[in-house]
Amino acid sequence: MSILIILIISIIFYLIFDFLYKNFSNRQFKGPLALPLVGSLLHLKDDTHLVFQNDSKLYKDGDNNGKIIKYWFCDQLTLAIYDTNTMKEIYLKNPESLNTRVKSPSTNVIGNRFRGIVTADENYWQFHRDILMKSFTGRKVKSLSSSIEKETIDLITYMKFIEKSGQSFSPRSNFMNFYSNIIFDYVFSRRIENIYEGVNEEQGKVLLAIRELFDYLADTLIVNYLIFTKPFYFLYLKMFGHPADSLKKILTKYYLEHSESIDLNNARDVLDSLIIEYRKVGGKEEQSSIIPMVNELILAGTETNSSTAEWFILTMVNNLDYQDKIYNELKSTLETTTAMIKLSNRNQTPLFNAALKEVLRLYPPVPFGVPRQVNQSFEINGGSLKIPKGTQIIQSLYSIFRDENYWDSPDQFKPERFLDQDSHSNNYFPYGIGVKNCIGMGFSQDELYISLSNLVLNFKLLPLIENSKICDKPIFGFSFKPNEFKINLEKRNN
């Protein structure tokens, strides 16, 4: 028998075994048919959020009642959680069993061997979270609101120029630059763009590097999940480079500048704080850990809030009656016509607060949460279900936030549902749940509150064509965002 025939027979046997294993193991969980090699990825390839939502209804007849559904991301067993009580049992009662991330070649390279914060494994996650929390509560944070206010004033000034010149306004590019400036000032004490002066060569490289990495992260690469391709793909990335490399080079330059000029008794920003905290424990792996940490802070701090701001603007344009109500509420809180909305006004703007919550419910920026991997098996549901070691756990937030069992008219924009502070609090967690929720939640909420409230206060946000609606069909990338759109601005006479 020739080697070729043996090889063909071996491949056929492997494909048969792979098909049987994926579909007949872990049978306590139901899920779609898994194909050899690719698993469930073809099932999920189009409008993934809607496929997940439909699956939650399709598999409601089993013991799990659609609460947990099994998928295979190539060779990676994945359980999607569709029920808030099940999610709380997993994340709140078993946090020690979810102490790591899925270790793919891409997360290995981005996290520099899993040393980041989003990509951190069980060896780094707790320490890195602790020192980041110290950085977020340090001296620099006290001036964060003033930084957001300054950037907001600059953006509004630019928007007034756009409105006066009769141009349309592009939320995507402007919000990306706006939120990038805030996070760069917070982390590095520098801006990356001045709206009026344009972008210099170095700033252009920063923006390009960020966008290239976003584009890469938008794709689910099969080679990240197939057992036999992982080592070869990792070797390829190390030999020929990764889209994260360009941004890492720039961040390394910023790190070295800070390292040389740092005052260990007076942190200027988050990067200084991280360096100081690492040197308190001897500085081991300082540079190799801090670079991926700030890299992930930049990505998360820019993309998710930029996407949320786009959804908020889209929703205001598509719901002009609510936009006017919110404007009247915001205007009534101000003592003078030249004042701006600040964090101190938050308790006086319940409708705006509810509208922002409702936008995050309808369009969660990370619709499946941040995946985690089970590092030790555990049982839930009174011991009737065992979550095996090595399983990837994802939260189907989009499905939960539109489940009619939890929400009245779940597909409609109804901010009134959040006017009662305790309403839906048990079923609403756009920033995650448990000790592993979003570390920058407060930062994000402050940014969104100051920036978006003042945009509505200063402008009537209108569609390009009168009485039309902007398409709210989302696209998937690093985050959940709308198709790119433009709007018209009409200056308010405050």
UniProtKB/Swiss-Prot annotation:
The chain crosses the membrane at residues 1-21. It holds the Pfam family p450. Keywords: Heme, Iron, Membrane, Metal-binding, Monooxygenase, Oxidoreductase, Transmembrane, Transmembrane helix. It is a single-pass membrane protein. GO terms for cellular component: membrane. The keyword Transmembrane helix applies. Its cofactor is heme. Its EC number is 1.14.-.-. It comes from the Eukaryota. It is found in: Membrane. Heme binds at C438. One of its GO terms (molecular function) is heme binding. Belongs to the cytochrome P450 family. PANTHER family: CYTOCHROME P450 508A4-RELATED, CYTOCHROME P450 518A1-RELATED. This is Probable cytochrome P450 518A1. The gene is cyp518A1.
